[in-house]
């Protein structure tokens, strides 16, 4: 079975379209890892893709309840032994005692006691890679063999340029990157050829349509987000305050 990681972005959409053209929609499944930090238009677009292509797209959303309790226990039992002041411990526990917020991105930041950054992209690992991998393993149990198609392109970064097009990881599980050597123009061309609209955010000065905003977003795009979608900037500011409450230094 072909499993395509769908993000709502142009590259994963082109990958989905390639899989459908080569194998037919009946032999393709999609999986969307909902980080809890997406734009509403992206959620709508993923639903549109499922309806337009006929491919079932499974929505995945991390639950950090167990990790949350472990972190709360660590703060309550270990911080005092490490000399952390009682006021700081009480401030952090006040947040954890409310329980998980139910938003994967925010819960992860609270547990980590910080926001992700370009040098600490734990968001990708925990919110996307882990749930998608777990889902692929579940599919292996059902289908016996799963080929995970990933929409990454070499011209996006030096690290991605070094990735192979195909990897067999054993146990019937493999990874294929069909658009690794494609350009952005090639990607949008695939949309046009299949009669599929791109994510509307691309027409609103956005170059990234995953997390809103992504930690890798440049200043120009942040400026565009603040003008077009100020509510997302306000939301991040609110989340920074919450995360700051569990930080020893009172910042996010």
Stretches with model-predicted labels:
Residues 1-252:
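Nucleotide-activated chemistry modules centered on ATP-dependent adenylation/adenylyltransferase
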């Amino acid at each position: 079975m072909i499993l395509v990681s769908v993000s709502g972005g142009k590259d994963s959409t082109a990958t989905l379209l390639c899989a459908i053209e080569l194998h037919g929609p009946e032999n393709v499944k999609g999986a969307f890892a909902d980080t809890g930090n997406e734009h509403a238009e992206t959620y709508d677009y993923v639903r549109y893709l499922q309806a337009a292509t006929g491919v079932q797209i499974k929505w995945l959303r991390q639950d950090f309840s167990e990790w949350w309790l472990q972190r709360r226990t660590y703060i309550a039992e270990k911080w005092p032994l490490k000399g952390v002041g009682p006021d700081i411990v009480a401030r952090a526990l006040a947040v954890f005692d409310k329980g998980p917020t139910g938003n994967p991105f925010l819960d992860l930041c609270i547990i980590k006691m910080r926001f992700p950054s370009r040098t600490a992209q734990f968001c990708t690992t925990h919110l996307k890679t882990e749930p998608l991998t777990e889902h692929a393993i579940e599919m292996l149990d059902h289908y016996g063999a799963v080929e995970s198609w990933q929409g990454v392109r070499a011209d996006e970064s030096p690290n991605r340029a070094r990735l192979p097009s195909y990897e067999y990881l054993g146990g019937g599980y493999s990874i294929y990157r069909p658009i690794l050597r494609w350009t952005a123009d090639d990607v949008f061309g695939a949309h046009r050829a299949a009669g599929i609209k791109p994510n509307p955010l691309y027409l609103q000065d956005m170059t990234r349509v995953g997390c809103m905003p992504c930690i890798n977003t440049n200043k120009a795009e942040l400026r565009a987000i603040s003008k077009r979608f100020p509510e997302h900037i306000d939301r991040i500011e609110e989340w920074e305050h919450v995360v700051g409450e569990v930080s020893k230094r009172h910042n996010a």
